[in-house]
Amino acid sequence: MPPKNYFVDSAVACDHPGFYLNYDRFRMWKLNRICAALAILSAGSPCVVSASPELIICQDDQLSVLSPTPEFVELACHFAIEAKTRLLECGLHQPNPIEIFLVERIEHDIGDCLATYDCTDEIIRVKQPESIADALVEGSPYSVLPTTVIFQALVSHEMAHALLEQSSRGTDLAFVDHEYVAAVMELDIIDPEWRQALIDAAPVRLPPKPGLISALIYGFEPRKFATNAWQYFNAEVDGCERIRQIADGNFSFTDQPR
């Protein structure tokens, strides 16, 4: 089991087929524990960074990027600020600085992944864009997306976990609620054309069903979970109100009838 100070995935984009590189093993692991955290990192060397990169502060000085390749710093800052802006619109907050590390490789006990959020150190780790395409599982829904869009989705997903965790003020939020918010933001923020491509790759019949927003469904069908989550968010009069309720501890999908 991972140390308590690491949040178990919801934040990890590895939990998505196509993001996660050994999905069968992941699925069994996922169903055998309750997620209390947002990312699991191996105790030894959680990431590989080349060539002594420098931490660059974004225009939003609460965000900074560490990258061995400077050309991706501006892109990472742009996507992080864009995601933060949307999350703030939904009532979340960022009281603490967040660092984003662009790395060649991220490892944990169940395999390699493309992105994680470490809530202890407030660090998001994302694979460098140039490494993403080769890391995707064959047939992944993400393989139809341009690399830049995948990178945007990864950054948005982890920013959602980070701001939800910071906004909860220590409230112990359920795994499924964390993953709901991250899935919603990942799909909500990318261009509608690419959002629809992901939805078409894992369609869920309308109307959206709150009973499908569960850790069990996420374990077996993460992309259908994400489709249903975004459709549920989009169908509500004020989808952001649900996110505010989750952050305040006033709502959980674990309490909804199945």
Question: Where do the model's predicted regions map?
Answer:
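Auxiliary, metal-adjacent structural segments of Zn-dependent hydrolase domains
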Residues: F72-I132, L145-T148
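Active-site recognition of the HExxH zinc-binding catalytic motif
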Residues: A153-Q166
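Post-HEXXH active-site segment of zinc metalloproteases
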Residues: E165-L187
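Long, well-structured alpha-helical subdomains associated
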Residues: P192-R258
